[in-house]
Amino acid sequence: MDYYLLTDLAATMGYHLAMSGAETFRVEDTIHRILRAYGVECEVFAIPNCVSVSLEAANGKPLMIMKRIGFHGNDLEALEKLNALSRRICAERPDVDEAMAWLEETMQACRSYSTGVFYLGSVLVGLGFCLVFGGTLLDCLWAGAMGLIIGLITRFMDKQEANPFFSTLLAACCMALPAYIAAGLGLMDSPDAAIIGALMILVPGLPITNSMRDIIYGDTNSGIIRVVQVILTALAIALGTAAAWHLTTGVYGLTGSTTVSWHPLAQAIAVFVGCCGFCILFNVHGRGCVLCIIGGVATWMLYLLWGALGCDIYAANLFAALFAALYAEVMARVRKCPSMPYLVITILPLLPGAGVYYTMSLGLEGNMMDAVAKGLETIGVAGALAVGILLVSSVFRILNRRIHGARTLES
């Protein structure tokens, strides 16, 4: 057996998983399982920037392969197909050359939306979530156009492999400028709602969920790295919108904002539209797309229900996050695929993008006490979401270990 080719197969599989947005645990576990299927023990170390695999060949010589991980994507289609391929390789244990050919065929077979459909997804996210955050129908149209601006800029910057911080800052600034100008001209009712709706595209949903899962699985280094990425993204969003605010305030002054409290059914339709957009942006296809959208709508409805029953914002987010995480884990086992696609889309309506924006807005207006209070509230909401996800993930991790241990004893 060619140990180098086998190690390269496992490392390449881990590389593609990481590039598609997989959490660190999945990358390391997949590599371990593939090599153990061929009777080889190994050591694996993965962080968001690289994956390293080392083992001892049959002749006793050590062998190590490291792959540098560059630009990370949000390709949940590839993530699901790669997970299915790893299961197939472990079950059938084909010749290493054949397994490598399977991997190449899988990557070529991964579907992706066209550029036009990608831009449509950006429009749908802005349009849908603007209404959720209290925008009027006119604001929703503006938010859709602003979402398109974000899509155009991020798509171009991704092709140039530009720094993510600068890309996010530029997209946030260019998106917010027309909103503040339109509000100053009286062409928009609620610029805040329109901006927040469009900003949901930039909210780092995948890094947030991955950081939580990395930490609960004991991959502290990776978890901390992802947390820093999340903080930098939030800072870029705040700086970008703040720059647009400063550029327009001197001309138009402070603009007012009128929000609308929509009926829960209208909000359900809006979340449906927004989640459709996110399924496009995260490259989710087929039945999985439908299940992700159902999960997102159900999560938001439960959040509204808990709020109507008298729960405060933290408890409502906690209970909704518990449902979202449970839904993702159950769907993953029903379809025998990673829970990540379901969790990312399902939890997105709860992410505190509005809190980040209002904290920045209040600070710029000089209301520092209110800004601090809103910032602490945003941190509390993020903490409630983290606790909900971690609780469910911990329970399922314990159950998986017990089931796997029982199967090992039986064999």
Segments and roles (model prediction):
Residues M1-A101, E105-M107:
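Soluble N-terminal domains of membrane-associated systems
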Residues C130-M146, P191-P204, T255-A270, A308-F323, ...:
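Structural signature of hydrophobic alpha-helical transmembrane segments
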Residues G128-F133, I149-D158, C174, P178-G186, ...:
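Alpha-helical membrane-inserting segments
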Residues G116-L120, C140-A145, F166-L170, V227, ...:
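Hydrophobic alpha-helical transmembrane segments
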